Amino acid sequence: MVQLYNLHPFGSQQVVPCKLEPDRFCGGGRDALFVAAGCKVEAFAVAGQELCQPRCAFSTLGRVLRLAYSEAGDYLVAIEEKNKATFLRAYVNWRNKRTENSRVCIRMIGHNVEGPFSKAFRDQMYIIEMPLSEAPLCISCCPVKGDLLVGCTNKLVLFSLKYQIINEEFSLLDFERSLIIHIDNITPVEVSFCVGYVAVMSDLEVLIVKLESGPKNGERVHHHPHKTNNRIRRTEEGISNEISQLESDDFVICQKPLELLGEKSEQSGLSVTLESTGLADEKRKYSHFQHLLYRRFAPDISSYVLSDDIKLHSLQLLPIYQTGSLTSDGKNLSQEKELLSLFCFFSLPHVGYLYMVVKSVELMSVYQYPEKSQQAVLTPQFLHVITSNNLQCFTVRCSAAAAREEDPYMDTTLKACPPVSMDVCALRIQLFIGLKAICHFKNHIILLTKAEPEAIPERRQSPKRLLSRKDTSVKIKIPPVAEAGWNLYIVNTISPVQLYKEMVDYSNTYKTVKTQSCIHLLSEAHLLVRAALMDASQLEPGEKAELLEAFKESCGHLGDCYSRLDSQHSHLTLPYYKMSGLSMAEVLARTDWTVEDGLQKYERGLIFYINHSLYENLDEELNEELAAKVVQMFYVAEPKQVPHILCSPSMKNINPLTAMSYLRKLDTSGFSSILVTLTKAAVALKMGDLDMHRNEMKSHSEMKLVCGFILEPRLLIQQRKGQIVPTELALHLKETQPGLLVASVLGLQKNNKIGIEEADSFFKVLCAKDEDTIPQLLVDFWEAQLVACLPDVVLQELFFKLTSQYIWRLSKRQPPDTTPLRTSEDLINACSHYGLIYPWVHVVISSDSLADKNYTEDLSKLQSLICGPSFDIASIIPFLEPLSEDTIAGLSVHVLCRTRLKEYEQCIDILLERCPEAVIPYANHELKEENRTLWWKKLLPELCQRIKCGGEKYQLYLSSLKETLSIVAVELELKDFMNVLPEDGTATFFLPYLLYCSRKKPLT
């Protein structure tokens, strides 16, 4: 049974001053109502709470059987009957119909208007005749594009809205019959059309398909009947033949109820064929279709009900558009709308069904009516249903489904929305005598009432005969009495904000007794406001701000309700409070702190919200009183979370004595841990008790302390207003235990508790350095990263950081601001990325007796990195410019880099010029294997040439030449050796080497 709330969604009402009893009526956009009676259509102006006034009237060809209005194109379309023939006509430019006798132009669909006649069509109403080969039964206009769908027996005809461009200033509305949808064995009672989605309904069947453009699966489209299951088709034909045979014996064959969703609906047995009738084949709008839903109902034979009690009614497709898809000035609404979600509603007399049909097809809600319904109309906020004497208002879940389509963050810790599956309810059952028809537009409900004498059946028929397919209606005999009275009412629905406030007031009756009932009603209020915000085209100026405020307030109310829950839904406290815009202090101020039976109980919802809020760095600091209450709350509900809570920046103002007392209680209660120890050490530091701090820090090994910091990073690092802020404990460790601090931050990075850039910023802020200055502690951290070989660290980026810093210090002769934690020897022994420094490098460095010892470590680390196996030498060359080759340090680095790039000849030239004593060690280390020829091709000629020139380095060159000749004499044959010797040399100098080379072969 649907829950009923006695609310007041309906406001004032007025009577429409029409002269004849309406046959049909419908809304006309934002400000008009059309009423068809006899052979005339009257248009009434409807604006807000003002009285309904006649606007214009125009004659029709005959009695109006169906009437529909399209906001896109601003036209009215009608099915009219005259002399037992039906006609389809569209009334365009009706707003220019000033008097009933004003001239009207009539033209056929697709008729080109000549220039001289265009002025007449611009300034007066004109009618478009749309001939059909079969009688039209029902019509529907696309609310987005303005296309017209017409239902006929076994087929649907689609007329596309288009415009004939007469000149630059004027275009004429027209239609083109673009598509025929053949559907075998169905007589449509109602159709609905929206942006390619087609819904068709017979007495007991509903079919929904989606028309699609472009070749299916990239293939050329051939128009032929859509293949259906042959077995099902044969079964259907067999049943049809059996029915014809058996009905003569008073047997009734009823098909089973059936629901097919998605691709399965192809098995419905209905043959669907598309026939394109557009003029231009390349501009074909729809070329194939997709089955979405098929549902078939069957009468309950055991109930012996009349046939009218088993007929479907009120088929409707309801679109919901993207929020903010309309232009700010409200113009070109139909062109600017972007479909977000689409819903389909249809109803039996006692049950209504609401489906979602866009991305997935699923049944959202089932409506059980307390009495037989006659008609229903669906809006984004409500479902309005009329029975013979009641107007019923039910809630819907359209906005809940659309919100999830629109926002990917829905149903997360950031945002929430009441579930689509939540039970619907009735807000109001309003008494109206003799209700016959209903329609809805904007914030108005139009009702037709007629008090008729009681209908008397002509004769009593057997239940079997009433269910016969040949006799689907009951003949009613009406006594020849005077026509009963009738009225056409406009019922104004109250504003969403006003109804929302009433629902909130109503929910207070359940607040302390039935939390779930309170949540249900507040959820309905929330969805009401959300739906109103989605339907931006219906909002009055200034109403949106009021709705947004109501939306936030409703989120706060829902947060309050869920905070009192201790169930699986208590986690919804967090997103609702977030959406409410309430601060944590404001939420705590709304909390009931009363104590019952001497025990304070805190529900899981509130604990969940506070816990997450304290973790999310909200830049909100609680005052001392609220902070103490929060600690007390967690000590009672979740004592293990107390250390984490105390580390939150929001708890900055808590009294350290209060914090320490709760931490000591944890020790005595058996909750002692490394995290409790570190938190006590941090609190002791705030209290200024250094002895207690030292004792706590000494109670565990350094490895355990690192594990504790990994469990709670906020002991070291906090964020305030988006900026990283080191804690007081981190500042203290920088001075007393920098190694522990670096190891802890490295552990945080290794466990994904802090990013690379965040860690760099932390050390810069910790050491009070600006963005361009690199403290030694950060260099220590980079070196520790290399040693640890973290998988997520980009090696070359880390190499670049370190080498840049080493080079900068060497070029500026800038010593580290603190003592490095590791020496170059430590790094070489601990890390494979730091290589052994080449022996000849030591010779180069030792040649400078005036070398500055303050930066020897930086030079050694840089040389070691360059000598390592992982370093990309080419990437560092552009950054070597500040390190001049004029210094021995710069010389060693430049020669090292060129050596790694295999520029050996250039390196030999540099060393011969700058440091000849290092040439032989260099050659011994580098000139091997394929480079061994450089001994006699490069080094030997260069030394001979420099010896000829003499100078201060003569003796160094001479000793180097002797070493070189010794190596060459071993490597070359005598003939080759003689060829590489200089022609003008002293024979006595080279003779020993020649003799050694000549004896080398016999000796071996």
Swiss-Prot record:
Q: Where is this protein chiefly located?
A: cytoplasm
Entry keyword Cytoplasm: yes
Q: In which tissues is it expressed?
A: Widely expressed. Higher levels of expression are observed in kidney, liver and placenta.
In UniProt terms, what is the effect of altering residue 397 to W? Answer: In HPS3; mild
Alphabetical GO CC annotations of the entry are: BLOC-2 complex; cytoplasm; cytosol; early endosome
- PANTHER family assigned to the protein according to its UniProt record, in alphabetical order: BLOC-2 COMPLEX MEMBER HPS3 (PTHR28633:SF1), HERMANSKY-PUDLAK SYNDROME 3 PROTEIN (PTHR28633)
Q: What does this protein do?
A: Involved in early stages of melanosome biogenesis and maturation.
Identify this protein by name: BLOC-2 complex member HPS3
Source organism phylogeny: Eukaryota, Metazoa, Chordata, Craniata, Vertebrata
